Amino acid sequence: MTNIIRQFLRQEAAGGLILIIAAAIALLMANSALQGVYQSFLDIPVSIKIASLDISKPLLLWINDGLMAVFFLMVGLEVKRELMEGSLAGRDKAVFPAIAALGGMLAPALIYLLFNGADEVTRQGWAIPAATDIAFALGVMALLGNRVPTGLKVFLLALAIIDDLGVIIIIALFYTQQVSLQSLGIAAAAIALLAYMNWRGVGKTSAYLLVGLVLWVCILKSGVHATLAGVIVGFMIPLHTQDQRSPSESLEHGLHPWVAYLILPLFAFANAGVSLQGVSLSGLTSLLPMGIATGLFIGKPLGIFTFSWLAVKLGIAKLPDAINFKQIFAVSVLCGIGFTMSIFIASLAFEGTDIALTTYSKLGILLGSTTAAVVGYSLLRLVLPARRKAVNVR
């Protein structure tokens, strides 16, 4: 294993721990006398004005829509590399996480509807447990450092990306009140330009990032989740150029410390502050939060593992290299960490209704996601091989 990969894995393990600490601090602040300070920090207005372009948002949205697009850019780079040359290379391996993601969206939604399908209002939240928070899931997995095989980590990344894309489509179709077709049209033109640059073998990373910035602004203005731009740019940057350079690998390596030590911990701090004020035991065990929690903790692994197992047994797909079904099940439990994406859907689903619905939705998400994180981490510790000792390379 090269020194670069060892350094990357060390960054991940440390970054995962920092992410968990940041989330814990946010939860404590949101339920203490510091709640006002915490909320004021997230509400700091940040504006960018360039000519006719004017983007004004609170700091929370800049973190979620802006900094997280950088995270998704890095994820896109890594998944593309594994699809082209790594553990997901080949159609039968590449289709495996896609089928798993489909099961991971269907089963939680159906379980939620078993609890809440009879109520016209709470039925609107059917997509809440369908989401996976890729940042938190990756952060929990990172706590295990180099015990995690590359193929298993990439399976989680690919599955979560497809899951997020599915959720973005669900939001656009069912929860978005207004979509700007003009902005989407310009975004489509930017994607076409990125594809042309890739086809022509343009190796300048800065050129892709510049067009990617335009793409991000257009998707943001369109009403669709702006982090989608990061994934698209990541897939468009060439893996290799004619002079044998790898713009993709260079950018990926450069982004890792920023993502591990700054972006993900800041994201965790900004989104984990769920207030528990005014919560009662009877409300916590009502159909809405229990449907969400059960959908995340039971529905996610049930759907992902069942669809994965069937896909392999029916010959539709193959397991990634050096991965077994015990590990797949452990990761499928970890995918029950819905957290921020689920909270976002809940805020859209119950917008304009009783505020208690949003509050108890968040509690269900917190309960299901925390349980999935603890159990998923424990299962991974059991099924993964012993920690590999680092070897110094001079």
Curated annotation (Swiss-Prot):
Record-level GO BP terms: regulation of pH
Membrane topology of the entry: Multi-pass membrane protein
GO molecular function: sodium:proton antiporter activity
Keyword terms: Antiport, Cell inner membrane, Cell membrane, Ion transport, Membrane, Sodium, Sodium transport, Transmembrane, Transmembrane helix, Transport
Chief place where the protein resides: membrane
TM stretches of this protein: 14-34, 59-79, 95-115, 125-145, 154-174, 179-199, 213-233, 254-274, 292-312, 328-348, 363-383
Record's catalysed reaction(s): Na(+)(in) + 2 H(+)(out) = Na(+)(out) + 2 H(+)(in)
Cited InterPro entries: Na/H_antiporter_dom_sf, NhaA
Compartments in which it is found: Cell inner membrane
Signal peptide extent: none
Cellular component GO terms held in the UniProt record: plasma membrane
Gene3D superfamilies given in the database record: Na+/H+ antiporter like domain (1.20.1530.10)
HAMAP family: NhaA (MF_01844)
Role summary: Na(+)/H(+) antiporter that extrudes sodium in exchange for external protons.
Protein family membership: Belongs to the NhaA Na(+)/H(+) (TC 2.A.33) antiporter family.
Name of the protein: Na(+)/H(+) antiporter NhaA
Species: Yersinia pseudotuberculosis serotype O:3 (strain YPIII)
